[in-house]
A protein has these predicted regions:
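Short hydrophobic/aromatic patch on the recognition helix
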Residues: 47-58
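Short helix-capping/turn signature of helix-turn-helix
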Residues: 58, 117-125
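Amphipathic alpha-helical packing segments from all-alpha helical-bundle domains
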Residues: 77, 107-110, 127-154, 165-168
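Hydrophobic/aromatic-rich alpha-helical bundle segments in the mid-to-C-terminal region
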Residues: 130-134, 152-200, 208-213
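Basic, helix-initiating cap at the start of DNA-binding domains
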Residues: 1-33, 40-46, 63-66
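An amphipathic alpha-helix adjacent to DNA-recognition modules
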Residues: 16-24, 36-37, 57-81, 95, ...
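Short coil/turn segments at alpha/beta junctions that flank glycine-rich nucleotide-binding fingerprints
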Residues: 32-36, 87, 108, 154
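Hydrophobic alpha-helical connector segments
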Residues: 67, 81-112, 163-170, 194, ...
Length: 213
């Protein structure tokens, strides 16, 4: 390996490390003080870098938060959906999603809470962030609906159940549960809520032979 190649590799490693630190600092600050009170200067300070580096790397706070949400989406299901559901359709697809969220809750509860907190920042009147988060939700819902709809053709969805409606019901229920979990962690058992939702979905949408499990 030549000196120039080694130098390039070290530079890429430093760049990757600084990006990870900046994203982590952003997640921490947004969780602590909210999007509005988080500044590029504070992000840089928390990560141990200059304000100038943050601006050069991402350009704006909204672009930085979009990058963070995208990274967390890759980790927590949105971008991982095709892999998670590669062999499941109908009710099995919905249950597989809930199982994955349950695993994430057990393995990385604080990171998962941070992901949901960032998604709810999309409610703020920030056009770029609002559109980005709305599109992320829409894409996730569309992908999941296609997998559930395939179950109608394979017998893995109860006859008469509308794939789009039951998918939207599931996603809305998870988002609502996540909101309550963020609001009142001491009194909201997120895992129990997911398990309860799974049982109700089986009763609602599983083929008759699955309804008693």
């Amino acid at each position: 390996m030549t000196d120039s190649v080694r130098s390039k590799n070290r530079q890429e490693e430093r760049s990757g490390l600084s990006t990870r630190r900046l994203l982590q600092a952003t997640a921490q600050l947004v969780a602590e003080v909210g999007y509005d009170r988080t500044t590029l200067a504070e992000i840089g300070k928390r990560a141990g870098y200059s304000h100038g580096l943050v601006s050069r790397r991402f350009g704006s706070k909204s672009a930085l938060v979009e990058t963070l949400i995208q990274k967390l989406s890759e980790r927590f299901g949105h971008e991982r959906l095709p892999e998670t559901l590669s062999h499941t359709t109908g009710i099995d697809a919905l249950l597989a999603v809930l199982i994955e969220i349950r695993k994430d809750s057990a393995n990385s509860p604080e990171s998962l809470r941070g992901f949901y907190a960032l998604l709810f920042e999309g409610l703020k009147p920030i056009p770029e962030l609002h559109t980005f988060v709305a599109d992320l939700h829409a894409g996730y819902l569309d992908s999941l609906t296609r997998q559930v709809a395939a179950g109608s053709r394979t017998g893995r969805l109860r006859r008469g159940v509308d794939p789009a409606e039951v998918t939207e019901l599931t996603v809305n229920a998870v988002r609502g549960l996540a909101y309550r979990w963020l609001l009142d962690e001491d009194r909201v058992d997120f895992d129990r809520g997911l398990d309860s939702l799974a049982r109700q979905l089986v009763q609602l949408a599983a083929p008759p032979e699955d309804g008693t499990r």
